């Protein structure tokens, strides 16, 4: 069930972030991404605490990405890591370039 749930969220052309609402790194990730002009429907924050099987979801994220911590940021079907990875990518200018290339920004 956790595998199907996670896989149903990860889609080409979309940015998906798996979060826990109380996590400060998740909030920082949400703040950064929410400032960008995404096209409607191409940015999704998935609260794994609402799914009810948090530990199973994190176990599957570990299997899929090598880490079970949140946030887990997917650009298209590729996991780019967590908050620090996203911030570093943004500071290097790579985030905007990548999002423009995939057509996610207005």
Curated annotation (Swiss-Prot):
| InterPro entries named among the record's database cross-references | GLR_AS (IPR011767), GLRX1 (IPR047185), Glutaredoxin (IPR002109), Glutaredoxin_euk/vir (IPR011899), Glutaredoxin_subgr (IPR014025), Thioredoxin-like_sf (IPR036249)
Keyword set includes Electron transport: yes
For the modification N6-succinyllysine, the affected residues are: 9
Its subcellular locations are:
Cytoplasm
PROSITE patterns in UniProt: GLUTAREDOXIN_1 (PS00195), GLUTAREDOXIN_2 (PS51354)
Which residues are annotated as modified residue N-acetylalanine in the UniProt record? 2
Q: Name a Pfam family for this protein.
A: Glutaredoxin
Sorted alphabetically, the Gene Ontology cellular component annotations on this record are:
cytoplasm
Give one GO term, molecular function aspect: glutathione disulfide oxidoreductase activity
Q: Which UniProt keywords apply?
A: Acetylation, Cytoplasm, Disulfide bond, Electron transport, Redox-active center, Transport
Q: List the disulfide bonds.
A: 23-26, 79-83
Domain called Glutaredoxin: residue spans:
3-106
Q: What does this protein do?
A: Has a glutathione-disulfide oxidoreductase activity in the presence of NADPH and glutathione reductase. Reduces low molecular weight disulfides and proteins.
Which PANTHER family does the UniProt entry name for this protein? Answer: GLUTAREDOXIN-1 (PTHR46185:SF1)
What NCBIfam families does the record point to?
GRX_euk
Q: Which family does it belong to?
A: Belongs to the glutaredoxin family.
Q: What is this protein called?
A: Glutaredoxin-1
Q: Which organism is it from?
A: Bos taurus
């Amino acid at each position: 069930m956790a595998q199907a749930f996670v896989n149903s969220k990860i889609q080409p052309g979309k940015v998906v972030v798996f979060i826990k609402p109380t996590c400060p790194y998740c909030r920082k990730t949400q703040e950064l991404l929410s400032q960008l002009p995404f096209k409607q429907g191409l940015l999704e924050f998935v609260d794994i605490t609402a799914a009810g099987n948090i530990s199973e979801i994190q176990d599957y994220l570990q299997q899929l990405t090598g880490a079970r911590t949140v946030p887990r940021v997917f650009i298209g079907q590729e996991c780019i890591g967590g908050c620090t990875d996203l911030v570093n990518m943004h500071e290097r200018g790579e985030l905007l370039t990548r999002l423009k290339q995939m057509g996610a920004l207005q």
